[in-house]
Amino acid sequence: MEDSDSAAKQLGLAEAAAVAAAAAVAAAAAAAAESEAEEPVLSRDEDSEEDADSEAERETRRVTAVAVMAAESGHMDMGTEALPSPDEAAAAAAFAEVTTVTVANVGSSADNVFTTSVANAASISGHVLSGRTALQIGDSLNTEKATLIVVHTDGSIVETTGLKGPAAPLTPGPQSPPTPLAPGQEKGGTKYNWDPSVYDSELPVRCRNISGTLYKSRLGSGGRGRCIKQGENWYSPTEFEAMAGRASSKDWKRSIRYAGRPLQCLIQDGILNPHAASCTCAACCDDMTLSGPVRLFVPYKRRKKENELPTTPVKKDSPKNITLLPATAATTFTVTPSGQITTSGALTFDRASTVEATAVISESPAQGDVFAGATVQEAGVQPPCRVGHPEPHYPGYQDSCQIAPFPEAALPTSHPKIVLTSLPALAVPPSTPTKAVSPTVVSGLEMSEHRSWLYLEEMVNSLLNTAQQLKTLFEQAKQASSCREAAVTQARMQVDAERKEQSCVNCGREAMSECTGCHKVNYCSTFCQRKDWKDHQHVCGQSASVTVQADDVHVEESVIEKVAV
């Protein structure tokens, strides 16, 4: 009985030690997560090493064993030692018990629930324990990395490196089903990776060193709608920003942060829906008894700049082919868009030929630009003779002249030159191959040439007559312009003189009246006349007396009668 009682007590101590060890594992994971959250800035080498480790471990999908052992130095293993036999366990039952905790990575990223099985591996004589207890470590534990942890029963941790992600406190009991995802939390639905608590109705926010709680149901347009509670007071996002000392920024969406990111990120992912400035709902009016329509904020879409290049590909210019017809062999000039000219075949040009050729340009998408009738020396056209005939000899128009070939120095192959000439009467492409030219055709060409010279002479004469007429008209217009300018100048001088005569003597303005005594001084008003009268009265009286003396009438003595008094 005493052995059984002591074994039962040891069993109770072992179970208590297992629960305490599991709690220590969770506390160690939480401490590691907090240390990583407080120090998000890592060196470049550490980031690269952790990324490499996480990728390698995702591919292998390992299962890591976590061993929780007693404080005795003889059992300080990393989980590789075999479990003790029943006799050894009975001898060491008074000191410690070995418990194995297995943490398995979960393949699905949507289900972040870890289940931990704690099994009593030690055996006591006469009592074999086969019970299993399920523990839930946390819903949001990161599955990227998990390593071996050795925890003593006294709570001290031997190794906690490599465990990433926050962990919730251990909750002994049956395994709970995973928490369903909120709407919009599906994979690929948001731009940023958010914690599930972001879908709560209340969010802890911060602006500089001031923290508050944002209530989504009371969010308005930013300037209106007191949705942030700080202490016992309610503030709108703009007021909360100003209280934190960021009023000059005037951008509460980037000043106020949640989980290290500005609220603009929540708005972009559709988690927060601010109202428009013209909204008249209850939240914007700060009166929950109202029921006005809700107008959501619509972000402004920037227009594309006008100077942006079009998205359609630029059409490349196809090279143009220039064919000289007629010729002995088909010869093609290819003009590339860069301006380079390439030829195919050999050409022989007549430098001194005077054949009346016609340049015809035809628009064809396949062949390009075709010039027909160039001064190309053909096989049927002979060089001019040395007797004195300037015209070349054609087949069927032979005479007794001896045709001498060109000397080698005068051959056009050394300095080739293309001469294109055109006539108004012959600007037609040849429809048939070149045939023998008859004498009537040659005479017709000579007549057409003479007619064209006459036409050019008449045109030059008409141009000369027109130029002479234009010169005469130019001289007449020049004389008329000078006369008009002289008349305008004379009229202007007369007007200026009249203005000077009729100006007020006192102030210089335009005069409206004149002095009734002498009729020589003008005034604009009675005020100027009274002001100038002190000086003018002497001049006005003298001129009147002089006028009277000049008007005296002399009477002869014979006419005067003596009157007795």
From Swiss-Prot:
One of its GO terms (molecular function) is DNA-binding transcription repressor activity, RNA polymerase II-specific. Residues 169-181 have a biased composition (Pro residues). GO terms for cellular component: cytoplasm; extracellular region; nucleus; RNA polymerase II transcription regulator complex. InterPro entries: SAND-like_dom_sf, SAND_dom, TF_DEAF-1, Znf_MYND. Zn(2+) 1 binds at residues 504, 507, 524, 528. Zn(2+) 2 binds at residues 515, 518, 536, 540. One of its GO terms (biological process) is behavioral fear response. Gene3D superfamilies: 6.10.140.2220, SAND domain-like. It comes from the Eukaryota. May be phosphorylated by DNA-PK complex in a DNA independent manner (in vitro). Residues 29-62, 162-189 are annotated as: Disordered. Transcription factor that binds to sequence with multiple copies of 5'-TTC[CG]G-3' present in its own promoter and that of the HNRPA2B1 gene. Down-regulates transcription of these genes. Binds to the retinoic acid response element (RARE) 5'-AGGGTTCACCGAAAGTTCA-3'. Activates the proenkephalin gene independently of promoter binding, probably through protein-protein interaction. When secreted, behaves as an inhibitor of cell proliferation, by arresting cells in the G0 or G1 phase. Regulates epithelial cell proliferation and side-branching in the mammary gland. This is Deformed epidermal autoregulatory factor 1 homolog. The gene is Deaf1.
